[in-house]
Amino acid sequence: MNTTFDIVHSEWDSFKTDGNKYNLVYLDPPFYTQKTYTMDDKKSVIGFDDNWNSIDEYMKWLLNVFETSFASLSPDGVIYSHNNFKINSFLLSRLPESIRNNFVTNISWLRSHPHNNIKNSWGNIVDSIMMISKTKKFYFKVLYGKLDNKYSKNSFTNKDEVGNYSLTPITGEKSRMGYDFEYNGVRPKFGWRYKKDKVVELNGKNLIHWGKNKPYKKLYLHESKGRPIQNFWNDIHPITRTELNKRNYPTQKPIKLLDRIIESSCPVDGKVLDPFGGSGTTLLASLENQIPSYVKTIDNNSDAIKLMTELSSKGIQKYF
């Protein structure tokens, strides 16, 4: 499937009239830093102004950004608000209860190496990426990272003639019709995760670990997909100022960060929106993965639009 896209030179809210419902919205707005961002070249105008009269002015603007973007989500859609922890906390507290109730999680991304010059507080080296869904039923694909030796040693502690294995739940978390039955002398309080024919099949293949307290499904080390990725991301490195990590935009995010968000939260035929396109990382990640059928990225800076257009025509560069 070829991903189609639009690069729109306009204000962030121009998507309101496009009639689309998006499966994924990624918000990476100004962070209320009270700074003006440009590239190192003093002649460059690629960047943005992040100066505000007050925090109240900024929060009023950001609340409008979030609620307007949230309204564009499809029923199974999710929105990621990338900011610092303070601002995302303020934002969550100001959102309507109907939206707050669909808060999914907060991802902490380790965006910086440890600081050696801290004096009066803990080093601030993580960004906050808040995930909120449109409804309780939203699209999500579990992603896996590489297994490290320590995790493998601590998790796959059981062993049989096939090999080392870990224990995964086979009993239910809540009662469901058709899953409440007795098997092998066991009738779990909340039933099973599988129907009886599946439980019988698993047991016939010796894939059930019958423990003293309750049964578990065996997950063998050699069959493991990896370690499920949680909400602390320390394996995606920030873009440095070296030649192999060329920075095209002051607050440019690594493409691997958007790869992960898109792969986990957008179906293959979905639509992605980035109202603050900047360097075009969301666009490039979408084109690289070919997951969404359509992606729209917006920016009000003509040089950012030019940059995104050039990069989208050239493809993914090595410094990403």
Report residues per predicted region:
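Core catalytic lobe of class I
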Residues: 1-309, 313-318
